[in-house]
């Protein structure tokens, strides 16, 4: 998220702070206008009919309050998301196919208003470990649904956790669920709000917690718990998991261990996109390993 910035190259969007406002405005009216125009012919009656249909379509469409707030926010701010346009587009394409959906985002930032506005009618929830940061973000975007999270891990423990988790039976995929009560596995997120456990998430974005200094929580538990929730999905379809900052060693290693290379369907910049089936559809997968 915005708060957890890497020291890499500057994002191209930083030079175009007006870009998201234009894009969001286009989402509201552009698709309907284009659809109407491509059907128009030189026939006068057809043109009149098309104009009437276009006006009716626009009149019927009502932007949600959070979409309108998002347009104004990004049109009047120099703050843009940390992710590049290409990275955002990967998630946006899935959102367009699945919305309205249940969208869980690890991390809260100046881009959170954008993510919520891209899921109109759906449920978008943000998890953040810094209570002061939550207060700062919600001051400008009070409509966001954000929860404070306390993690049990530290980035300095990543190597040990990765090499020893198999020694704890409750960390294995066959026994790790439900993670709400799984105190024996240090990678399980056990102290989250009820909404986290009671909702079946269609999309999960892991772009937090902090993971760039030893005392930080790291994203180990977020990645592990995302994999467990995806494997235990009860509804139809797969769970889409997006992991940002895969250029970092811990994110890369834990993604390969728990999200699995064979489920990776897209990769651009520092973002990996996984499409994970539930355990019932993993006919070739034993219960003692993830990949």
Curated annotation (Swiss-Prot):
Pfam families: IRX15_IRX15L_GXM. It is an enzyme of class 2 (transferase). The lineage of its organism: Eukaryota, Viridiplantae, Streptophyta, Embryophyta, Tracheophyta. It is found in: Golgi apparatus membrane. Its EC number is 2.1.1.-. It comes from Arabidopsis thaliana. InterPro entries: IRX15/GXM/AGM (IPR006514), SAM-dependent_MTases_sf (IPR029063). The chain crosses the membrane at residues 18-38. This is Arabinogalactan O-methyltransferase 2. GO terms for biological process: plant-type cell wall modification; protein methylation; xylan biosynthetic process. Its main location: Golgi. GO terms for cellular component: endosome; Golgi apparatus; Golgi membrane; trans-Golgi network. Belongs to the methyltransferase superfamily. Disruption phenotype: The double mutant agm1 and agm2 results in the absence of methylation on arabinogalactan glucoronic acid side chains. The gene is AGM2. Involved in the methylation of glucuronic acid of different plant cell wall component, but mainly on side chains of arabinogalactans. NCBIfam families: A_thal_3515. It comes from the Eukaryota. It is a single-pass membrane protein. GO terms for molecular function: glucuronoxylan 4-O-methyltransferase activity. Keywords: Golgi apparatus, Membrane, Methyltransferase, Transferase, Transmembrane, Transmembrane helix.
């Amino acid at each position: 998220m915005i708060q957890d910035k890497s020291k890499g190259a500057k994002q191209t969007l930083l030079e175009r702070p007006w870009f998201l406002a234009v894009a969001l405005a286009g989402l509201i009216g552009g698709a309907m206008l284009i659809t109407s125009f491509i059907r128009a012919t030189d026939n006068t009656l057809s043109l009149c009919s098309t104009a009437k249909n276009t006006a009716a379509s626009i009149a019927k469409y009502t932007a949600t309050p959070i979409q309108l707030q998002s347009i104004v926010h990004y049109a009047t701010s120099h703050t843009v998301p940390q992710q590049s346009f290409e990275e955002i587009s990967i998630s946006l394409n899935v959102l367009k196919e699945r919305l309205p959906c249940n969208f869980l985002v690890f991390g809260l930032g100046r881009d959170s208003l954008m993510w919520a506005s891209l899921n109109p009618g759906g449920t978008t929830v943000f998890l953040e470990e810094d209570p002061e940061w939550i207060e700062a973000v919600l001051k400008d975007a009070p409509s966001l649904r954000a929860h404070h999270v306390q993690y049990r891990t530290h980035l300095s423990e990543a190597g040990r956790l990765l090499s020893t988790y198999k020694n704890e039976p409750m960390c294995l995929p066959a026994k790790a669920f439900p993670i709400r009560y799984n105190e024996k596995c240090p990678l399980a997120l056990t102290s989250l709000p009820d909404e986290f456990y009671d909702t079946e998430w269609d999309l999960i974005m892991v772009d937090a917690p902090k993971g760039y200094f030893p005392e930080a929580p790291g994203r180990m538990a977020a990645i592990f718990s995302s994999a467990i929730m995806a494997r235990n999905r009860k509804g139809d379809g797969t769970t889409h998991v997006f992991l940002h900052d895969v250029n970092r060693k811990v994110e890369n290693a834990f993604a390969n261990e728990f999200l699995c290379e064979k489920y990776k369907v897209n990769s651009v910049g520092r973002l990996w996109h996984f499409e994970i089936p539930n355990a019932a559809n993993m006919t070739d997968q034993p219960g003692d390993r993830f990949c």
